[in-house]
Design a protein with these regions (language model features):
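Short amphipathic alpha-helical "recognition" segments used for binding
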Residues: 9-10, 244
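Beta-rich carbohydrate-recognition and catalytic domains
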Residues: 24-259, 263-351, 366, 372-424
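Compositionally biased, low-structure terminal segments
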Residues: 1, 14-15, 360
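Catalytic and ligand-binding motifs that coordinate phosphates/metal ions
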Residues: 352-360
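Structural secondary-structure packing elements that flank or coincide with functional cores
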Residues: 361-365
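Hydrophobic h-region of N-terminal signal peptides that target proteins for export
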Residues: 12-21
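Bacterial N-terminal signal peptides that target proteins for export
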Residues: 1-8
Length: 424
């Protein structure tokens, strides 16, 4: 409480709070790094809207505490330094006034020291996480985006969080990558590097566009969108032509989501795998903006993946693997437009693992297919929820019955966190 009083006094010089006919309202001049939000689960969620320099930026719901907080969440606003944020809140002015602008995270000294905090698996500092998104290796760093509610430990307000690593074990959490907008909240997707500048977003050979694809979810529909970065994934600009695919009417379904995009070299085009209604569809594009429907395969569900692997022990034999979020997969052939399964559905994930995705853009000199999956474990009253399982390498083997099976092995990087114990 003493810290809250001290920081509130500091904030007086640049904060204007006022009553509004539509609820509480407060304008804050950003000259510190973090907005801190007190959360109380005894309260109902209320809508909170951010407007930056007169432009509506995003809308979320939050349980802002009027008194003592169960815990604090935060938003890094350093990219908005010098700008003014207007926060409109459908709850009380008293709760809104408890938001603290500071150069530190409230309760930050306890982060990673909580009694329930996993030490070897990635967890976010505060809030909820689920599906890994946009896994990609670029210029020496593994980027992992993820489904994230930064304002509460429970699911809601889907943003894209962002973390980076040089070794797949030690992760450095970044600023939020994508915020909800007028099209919807930010559901799952993927990332590519547009080396040939097919989209026109790039700025020369040395600065290709880092492009992410995501689903914008709203009560009326799920639509596919994209954004691009020219600073190696630190900030993103949403494509002004979004959405790039709106197929909910065609399928008469709200379940049209989770784009996975890859470059299909033999055809010199982009391919997208998209969950639509009862299975996975394939779309193609020459420029990442305009997409043409090609085919559909039933039997798999959300968070689609599609990648090629050599058969272990016979590198000249290569097959494609398509899977869904629950870990069911098929092995088959892919011509850039149609995936033809040659095996029945099999199971790769078990237990709490869900929505695994593989890293794109792994150097050919490495050659591995590395996946990360979300674990649906909860942590009770902790101020965070959800974790990512350790990375695994995917291997395709021939079975004794003449078929193919996908195996998962701990990535070699995990050896650094294990110690072999001698047995007497």
């Amino acid at each position: 409480m003493n810290s809250l009083k001290k920081l509130s006094l500091v904030a007086i010089s640049f904060v204007l709070a006022m009553a509004s006919a539509d609820g509480a309202e407060r304008s804050i001049k950003i000259n510190r790094q973090y907005l801190n939000f007190p959360v109380s689960h005894s309260l109902e969620r209320k809508a909170m809207t951010f407007t930056v320099d007169g432009r509506k930026e995003s809308r979320s719901v939050i349980r802002l505490a009027e008194g003592a907080a169960d815990y604090w969440t935060f938003r890094d606003v350093s990219q908005l330094r010098g700008k003014t944020i207007k926060i409109t809140y459908e709850g009380s002015q008293k709760a809104l006034d408890n938001i603290v602008l500071a150069d530190s995270i409230m309760g930050g000294s306890m982060i990673y020291h909580e009694s329930s905090r996993p030490q070897y698996h990635f967890t976010t500092r505060r809030g909820w996480i689920n599906d890994p998104n946009g896994l990609i290796f670029y210029r020496g760093k593994y980027h992992m985006f993820y489904q994230h509610n930064p304002y509460e430990r429970d699911w809601e307000n889907m943003h894209w969080g962002h973390t980076v690593s040089t070794d797949l074990i030690h992760w450095d959490e970044q600023q939020l990558a994508l915020h909800p907008d007028e099209i919807g909240t930010m559901f799952s997707g993927t990332a590519v590097i547009d080396y040939s500048n097919t989209s026109g977003f790039g700025r020369g050979k040395d600065n290709p566009a880092f492009v992410v694809f995501y689903t914008a979810d709203s009560p009326s529909a799920q639509r596919q969108c994209m954004a691009y970065s020219l600073d190696e994934g630190r900030t993103f600009t949403k494509y002004e032509g979004n959405p790039i695919i709106d197929s909910h009417e065609k399928w008469q379904s709200h379940d049209t989501r989770d784009p996975k995009v890859l470059w299909y070299a033999p055809g010199k085009h982009w391919s997208m795998v998209l969950n639509e209604r009862d299975g996975h569809s394939i779309y193609t594009s020459s420029n990442l903006k305009d997409w043409t429907y090609q085919s559909h395969l039933t039997g798999l569900w959300e968070c689609p993946e599609l990648f090629e692997l050599p058969v272990e022990g016979n590198p000249s034999e290569r097959k494609w693997v398509m899977w869904g979020a629950s870990g069911t997969y098929m092995v088959g052939d892919f011509d850039g437009k149609v995936f033809t399964p040659i095996t029945p559905k099999q199971q790769n994930l078990i237990g709490s693992a869900y929505a695994a995705q593989t890293f794109s853009n792994i150097p050919q000199s490495d050659g591995r297919v590395i996946k990360m999956a979300w674990s649906r474990l909860g942590f009770g009253d902790a101020p965070f929820n959800g974790l990512m399982l350790l990375p695994q390498e995917q291997v395709l083997v021939r079975t004794h019955f003449g078929g193919w099976q996908l195996l998962s092995r701990p990535a070699r990087e995990t050896e650094s966190i294990f110690t072999l114990a001698e047995q007497g």
